[in-house]
Amino acid sequence: MNEIPRIIDQLEREHAGEPWHGSPLMQILSGISHAQAAAKPIANGHSIWELVLHITAWKNETRHRLSGGRAGDPQEGDWPAVGETTAPAWREAVERLELAHRLLVSAVRDLPEPKLFEPTNDLRSDGIAPTYSELLHGIVQHDVYHAGQIAILKRASSAT
C-alpha cells in the first residue's frame, strides 16, 4: 500500500471508521444534544461544540496547507466562537465538520505521492518546515486527541 491510501485510511478510521483506540469521532458525537454540546462542565474548559468547531477549523487549515497555503491559524480562528446554541445550529456545526472531513480526504486523494515528502509552507519556528506527510499524520493525532476530550465531556454531561 502506498502512503496516500494509508493516510486516508487513518483519516477515515478516526473520523467514522474502526480505529484501534476505540470509538471514532462521529460515533462519539452521535446522540449529543445541542444543550450537551454547549455545556461547559469543566471550569475554564471547552465545550463539545467549541471542540467540534476547532476540529473543523483545523481540517480546513490542513486542506489550505495542502494546496500550498502558508501555515498559520485557521481562517475561522483557532477556537471559533459558537454563536447561537440551538438544535439547528448544532446540526449545522456537525454537518460542517463532516464536509471539512470529506474535502480534506478528497484533497489528500488528489495529492501526488512525492509531495508527501516535501516541506510545507511553514517556517514559523526553527526554519525547518514539516513535510506534508507529517502535517497529515498530525491532523489525525489532533483529531484523536480532541475526540477523547469530547468523549469525556459527553460522559460527564450524561452523568448529571
Where are these regions (language model features)?
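Short, contiguous alpha-helical
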Residues: 2-22, 26-29, 34-81, 121-160
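Acidic/histidine-rich alpha-helical segments that form the ligand environment
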Residues: 82-119, 134-139
